């Protein structure tokens, strides 16, 4: 009986290795070819605060990048809270296992996949400011998401306003969309 099980397992393994691997998810397409898409990313802080979750945010931005043309993605809107805490260097295993800098770097790295391909607009959240949650207004947002890094912002950003430090930043900016069929 053991010999039969080993033979069966060997045949299944051998046949599975001969099957072609799927390189990408099934191609996406719009129901109405005249329409376009805007993608909404919810608070990514849950992805960035644990190192084990960070690849999930990478997968989200990879999927977006892979579908820009087929879904006619005109913009990615992010509700903010890129990080759990803006300026915390103390790890708390129950709440997070990344420092704030590591969280900012993970968010920035995931979003880089979209640079020069599609504009992404981030509404900075309360967790993106202060030490824990906006108590002093300081943020690393412009250090990790500077205007210059994504050329697609030039076409739709109508203004960058000064932040609390007097620095023009995407954390306080205005965008304008001019697409047929919009609005």
Which residue ranges define each predicted feature?
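Short amphipathic alpha-helical segments and helix-helix/interface helices
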Residues: 9, 61-65, 108-112
